[in-house]
Amino acid sequence: MSEISVTQTLNTLGLRCPEPVMLVRKNIRHLNDGEILLIIADDPATTRDIPSFCQFMDHTLLQSEVEKPPFKYWVKRGK
C-alpha cells in the first residue's frame, strides 16, 4: 500500500482494554471526515476491538499491522 498521510497519531502503549478504544473514540471525533488517525497499541485486545469499533462507528480501517506488538492501525474518519 502507498504511504498513508496521517493527520494525528495516538500512542496507547501500556494501556489495556477498554482504554485504547475509549481514547480512539475521543480523538477521532476531533478529526474531520477523511482525516487519518494512526493508533499504536500493544494490547492484544485491540486486534479485535479496533476493527469492531470502525465497523460499528462507520469509520474505515485502511490498514493494520498486527503480526507482533506494537500493533498499528490506520483509521480514516468516516467511510
Curated annotation (Swiss-Prot):
Free-text function comment from the UniProt entry: Sulfur carrier protein which probably makes part of a sulfur-relay system.
Leader peptide range in chain numbering: none
Record lineage: Bacteria, Pseudomonadati, Pseudomonadota, Gammaproteobacteria, Pasteurellales
Coiled-coil residues: none
Name of the protein described by the UniProt record: Sulfur carrier protein TusA
NCBIfam families: PRK00299.1 (NF001423)
TM stretches of this protein: none
Family statement: Belongs to the sulfur carrier protein TusA family.
Keywords of the record: Cytoplasm
GO CC annotations on file: cytoplasm
UniProt source species: Haemophilus influenzae (strain PittGG)
InterPro entries (alphabetical): Sulphur_carrier_TusA, TusA-like, TusA-like_sf
One example GO MF annotation: sulfur carrier activity
Active site residues of this protein: 17 (cysteine persulfide intermediate)
Pfam families named among the record's database cross-references: TusA (PF01206)
Gene Ontology terms: biological process: tRNA wobble position uridine thiolation
Localization annotation: Cytoplasm
